[in-house]
Amino acid sequence: MTQAQTAATVQPDAIPVAAPVSQRWRVADVVALFELPFNDLLFRAQQVHREHFDANAVQLSTLLSIKTGGCEEDCGYCSQSSHHDTGLKAEKLMDVDAVLDAARAAKANGASRFCMGAAWRNPKERHMPALTEMVRGVKELGLETCMTLGMLEDEQAQELASAGLDYYNHNLDTSPEFYGQVISTRTYQDRLDTLDRVRDAGINVCCGGIIGMGESRRERAGLISQLANLNPYPDSVPINNLVAIEGTPLEGTAPLDPFEFVRTIAVARITMPKAVVRLSAGREQLDDGLQAMCFLAGANSMFYGDQLLTTSNPQSQKDRALFERLGIRSSDADAMSANA
């Protein structure tokens, strides 16, 4: 029997849906999901998605860079690192009023979550009053709030929680095995420690990674395994497709096979069935057909607007047109809660 004939005999119902509650996702288990026939993988991911979410609703988030450039970290993918010559000019923290103006515009454009990102290793104490004021102001507009500011101390996480921050983003970026090839100034454990502080403060965790940085499929599976085995797994999982920026160490990295990106979305959905899975940076590299496949694979959120920190993003009008063609509607944050 040929390999194709063997694959054809596999029934989708025989494919494991998810690990039992008591079982951790081993890397080998996640690799096995990646290696399923493409149609079977998407079929199973869509089944899992429909068990927990409205399959035709996508939550829209807008991301604003509130402090751009000059970061002390040496992340090999990032244009904002002071270690790389990308021509990006470092800027100071934005004024609160300017941030709130941007939030109003995002809400008028259909976003239900407003994310604020600062290029820091960690925020300083002098920044905290402005940051907490931003959180309170954005919440008063009726938007969900999210911040990504680097590593946090316990007290800082508590301050943000007291201000009403809904989500804190701190990505693992990649697998532990590949991590050292991308970053040297922050350890993997540093990232895990910040996630613990955020969770202990009562803030929802937003945590994902970047694929297409030259890692192997097994290393992609290692990232998903790490995320799925967090206790609990993240409420929100952004999946970024590398944007190879000139002047960064990864500028010459070969593009990832787009079907591998779709596979990653599907595997994230299966292993983290109640998480919101978000299409993030690099979405402009996907044509409409591939984005539709991502929604079929279980993506149910995306960053919306013309710029994602310092990388471009598909125009809002184009996104609306795609939603109309697919019969997808935007959903507010409350409606995106997973079904029991």
Curated annotation (Swiss-Prot):
Record-listed [2Fe-2S] cluster binding positions: C115, C146, C206, R278
Pathway: Cofactor biosynthesis; biotin biosynthesis; biotin from 7,8-diaminononanoate: step 2/2
Molecular function as annotated in GO: 2 iron, 2 sulfur cluster binding; 4 iron, 4 sulfur cluster binding; biotin synthase activity; iron ion binding
Reaction catalyzed: (4R,5S)-dethiobiotin + (sulfur carrier)-SH + 2 reduced [2Fe-2S]-[ferredoxin] + 2 S-adenosyl-L-methionine = (sulfur carrier)-H + biotin + 2 5'-deoxyadenosine + 2 L-methionine + 2 oxidized [2Fe-2S]-[ferredoxin]
Subunit structure: Homodimer.
Primary role: Catalyzes the conversion of dethiobiotin (DTB) to biotin by the insertion of a sulfur atom into dethiobiotin via a radical-based mechanism.
Protein name: Biotin synthase
Taxonomic placement: Bacteria, Pseudomonadati, Pseudomonadota, Betaproteobacteria, Burkholderiales
